[in-house]
């Protein structure tokens, strides 16, 4: 498995402990789903301005958001629908996709919701990972299922709501 985390913002300090927590959370999401394939996932930590630009380019919404996911493999609720995904043939890995997280939004929302920055960051990260795995919140049932999965990971990491 390969996890790439790139920090392209300078507004919020990202410590080694935060990076380790992020990697652990990603691995836990995939283990929770019993994802058996070698994989690659890229995380980009950005600021409000950059995520606003990308949100506008990709979704025609001209405002910053907290997290954006760009899945590469066609999945639905954790199951690969098509084998036409992107594979790294040299390494034999499935490239799941990219997740962008606004560190400014994560900080703002942690203060708004009254919990730690780490909890909010990992909530957003797991949200993005489950989107890469084909989960969505487009119906009440699917939303409940997705958020239950996120909360299970947060609970395992002792990052429950206060």
From Swiss-Prot:
Pfam families for the chain: YbeY
Cofactor note: Binds 1 zinc ion.
GO molecular function: metalloendopeptidase activity; RNA endonuclease activity; zinc ion binding
Enzyme Commission number(s) of this protein: 3.1.-.-
Disulphide-bonded residues: none
Membrane-spanning segments: none
Record's keyword terms, sorted: Cytoplasm, Endonuclease, Hydrolase, Metal-binding, Nuclease, Ribosome biogenesis, rRNA processing, Zinc
GO biological process, one term: rRNA processing
GO annotation, cellular component aspect: cytoplasm
Binding annotation for Zn(2+): 127, 131, 137
Cell compartments where the protein resides: Cytoplasm
Cofactor annotation: Zn(2+)
Family per similarity comment: Belongs to the endoribonuclease YbeY family.
Job description of the protein: Single strand-specific metallo-endoribonuclease involved in late-stage 70S ribosome quality control and in maturation of the 3' terminus of the 16S rRNA.
Name of the molecule in the record: Endoribonuclease YbeY
Native source organism of the sequence: Acetivibrio thermocellus (strain ATCC 27405 / DSM 1237 / JCM 9322 / NBRC 103400 / NCIMB 10682 / NRRL B-4536 / VPI 7372)
Gene: ybeY
């Amino acid at each position: 498995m390969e996890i790439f985390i790139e920090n392209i913002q300078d507004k919020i300090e990202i410590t080694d402990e935060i990076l380790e927590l992020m990697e652990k959370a990603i691995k836990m999401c995939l283990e929770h789903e019993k994802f058996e394939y070698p994989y690659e996932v890229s995380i980009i930590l950005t600021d409000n301005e950059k995520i606003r630009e990308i949100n506008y380019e990709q979704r025609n919404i001209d405002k910053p958001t907290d997290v954006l996911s760009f899945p590469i493999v066609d999945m639905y609720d954790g199951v690969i629908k098509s084998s036409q995904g992107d594979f790294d043939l040299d390494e034999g890995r499935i490239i799941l996709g990219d997740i962008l997280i606004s560190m400014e939004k994560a900080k703002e929302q942690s203060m708004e919701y009254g919990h730690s920055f780490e909890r909010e960051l990992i909530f957003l990260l797991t949200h993005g990972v489950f989107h890469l795995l084909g989960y969505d919140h487009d119906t009440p049932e699917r939303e409940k299922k997705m958020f239950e999965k996120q909360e299970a990971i947060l609970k395992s990491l002792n990052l429950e709501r206060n």
